[in-house]
Swiss-Prot record:
Free-text tissue specificity from the UniProt record: Ubiquitously expressed.
Task performed by this protein: Non-catalytic component of the RNA exosome complex which has 3'->5' exoribonuclease activity and participates in a multitude of cellular RNA processing and degradation events. Involved in regulation of antisense ribosomal siRNA production. Involved in response to cold-warm shock.
Protein name, UniProt field: Exosome complex component CSL4 homolog
Keyword GTP-binding: no
Primary site of residence: nucleus
């Protein structure tokens, strides 16, 4: 992968470390080198005590604040699309921070324990909170068990589903903070709806 390439956690940087020395922001798995943080690939060299040239490859945040604002970071509020739902996680794609829409979507996981505050062992199925193709407002957070992807949380009241559709592609309307209704069939479904701040930019019904 070329220097200055934008990478996310879990992205492959090199097939093998080869001539490089591994620097910060990287980890090795199955002899391949992957990014452990979001940032830009950087390569630099220095002379060791034997005057040999050592090349180091790393992933680091840009010194340009405008570049950093384009990357998901711990504590950032992002808009994401739910791609699939399992027993322990929902797989999501981060699509924007505020009004900045990414050309590249960043893969993320929404763990079951990040759905509601103070309820780490939820007995309810995932579908009571989010479903595939929902758009959610979420916070980027940390999880000691997940190191190769962004981790999302919708535990706070302001976070959750902001846009969803029914089985026929019709818009679903909010009944209350835990329920939506189909504009076509009148059938209700459970969701954890976000109590969205007024200044927050949200996806529209035209989003695919």
């Amino acid at each position: 992968m070329l220097a200055e390439t934008l990478v996310a956690p879990g992205d492959k940087v090199l097939d093998a470390i080869g001539e490089y020395r591994m620097g910060k922001g990287l980890y090795e798995a199955n002899r391949r080198i992957f990014a452990s943080v979001a940032g830009f690939v950087n390569v630099y060299g220095f002379r060791d005590k034997s005057d040999n040239l050592v090349q180091v490859i790393e992933v680091r945040r840009s010194e340009d604040q405008l570049d950093n604002e384009l990357l998901p970071f711990h504590g950032a509020i992002v808009t994401a699309k739910v791609m699939a739902v399992g027993l322990r996680f929902a797989k999501c794609d981060i699509i924007s921070i505020g009004d900045k829409v990414y050309k590249k979507r960043f893969s993320a996981l929404l763990p079951k324990k990040k759905l509601r505050p103070l309820e780490p062992e939820l007995s309810e199925p995932f579908k009571n909170f989010v479903r595939p193709n929902d758009y959610i407002l979420a916070k980027v957070c940390e999880d000691a068990e997940i190191k190769d992807k962004f981790v999302l949380s919708i535990a706070e009241d302001e976070l959750g589903v902001v846009l969803c559709r029914g089985r026929f592609g019709e818009p679903m309307q909010k009944v209350d903070w835990n329920t939506v209704v189909s504009t076509r069939t009148g059938k209700t479904e459970p969701r954890k709806m976000a109590k969205v701040p007024q200044k927050c930019t949200l996806p529209t019904q035209s989003v695919a």
